[in-house]
């Protein structure tokens, strides 16, 4: 088999890495710089209104509340105009993200199927080996359980110091039959 580990459907594949949240934030700030500007203006107006309220300056307080309303209106207009302006680009980006997600899910599905095929092949190989041992045992007149006991005994015999050349499963079964 290959040196690579079996693929798993739970693996995350860095090949399909999209933009992280910071890159997305930077991109959105470049696309619509007026929205953060409006948010900053609103926050500044609220902060100044708070300072005016603490100082007891009601004229400045009222003026800052009006500026806050203007800044919020500016932010709202920036959101609406930006939404209209970037509508087609957002639709294209959404379609691209959908295609990337579909490609990623297809790749995961393919990896999962490959993993299942490999495991299925290993299972078939094991069953074939097991069937060959059973056939050899039937030919020799032994029960399959006796074969496994005999093989376990032979491996114990090998550990005790019996030096034998490469003995296959069939040879081991034949040797067991000859010994009886």
UniProtKB/Swiss-Prot annotation:
One Gene Ontology cellular component: mitochondrial membrane
Coiled-coil region(s): 84-111
Region (Disordered): 135-165
Keywords: Coiled coil, Membrane, Mitochondrion, Transmembrane, Transmembrane helix
Topology within the bilayer: Multi-pass membrane protein
Reported function: Cytochrome c oxidase subunit which plays a role in assembly of respiratory supercomplexes.
Assembly with partners or alone: Associates with the respiratory chain complex III/complex IV supercomplex.
Protein name per UniProt: Respiratory supercomplex factor 1, mitochondrial
Record organism: Coccidioides posadasii (strain C735)
């Amino acid at each position: 088999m290959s040196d690579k580990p079996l693929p798993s459907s739970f693996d995350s594949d860095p090949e399909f890495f999209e933009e992280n949240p910071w890159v997305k934030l930077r991109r959105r700030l470049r696309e619509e710089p007026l929205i953060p500007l409006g948010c900053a203006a609103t926050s500044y107006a609220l902060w100044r209104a708070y300072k005016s309220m603490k100082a007891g300056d009601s004229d400045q307080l009222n003026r800052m509340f009006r500026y806050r309303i203007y800044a919020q209106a500016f932010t709202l207009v920036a959101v609406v105009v930006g939404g209209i302006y970037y509508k087609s680009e957002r639709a294209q980006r959404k379609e691209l993200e959908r295609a990337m997600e579909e490609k990623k899910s297809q790749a995961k599905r393919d990896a999962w199927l490959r993993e299942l095929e490999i495991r299925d092949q290993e299972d078939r190989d094991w069953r074939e080996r097991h069937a060959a041992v059973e056939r050899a045992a039937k030919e020799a007149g032994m029960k399959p359980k006796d074969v496994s006991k005999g093989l376990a005994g032979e491996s114990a015999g090998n550990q005790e110091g019996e030096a034998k050349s490469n003995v296959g499963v069939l040879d081991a079964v034949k040797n067991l039959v000859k010994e009886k």
